[in-house]
Amino acid sequence: MAPLRGWCAKGRRLPARVPHGHWKTLTFLAGLRADGVVAPCVFDGPINGTCFRAYVEQILVPALRPGDVVILDNLGSHKGAAVRHAIRAAGAHMLFLPPYSPDLNPIEQVFAKLKHLLRKAAKRTLEDTWRTIGDLIHAFPPKECQRYLVNAGYASA
């Protein structure tokens, strides 16, 4: 990801490298607990119902504990019967957000920080970006994750 802004002296050009060619889409999925980010996964390209189902069954469900709440937006792939069954079979509950309410989804704050850190790292290849994401998962300490949950209204301090 390329940085969006830069700084230089007034009246001078900012020298910077910018990517040329087609944009590449990466999809990052993860869960958020009060003690950190769990079940991270990066897909090369956009996801569909099949990809999301595989993520839930193979990565998210093993990380779930009975009584966990899985917060989902209204993306069509989130509403599949197999996804609902897998999450409920793990003893977790599902909470669907109202339309257009990213402020109620605490993982959005994680994604915002992750995007900022990725732009700052300015990696140009998919492999470097994947490695950087893997390293950045540890940039979310428990106190910060707790604040994200409190800010979205799901827990008290």
Residue ranges and their predicted role:
Residues 1-157:
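Short functional hotspots at interaction and active-site rims
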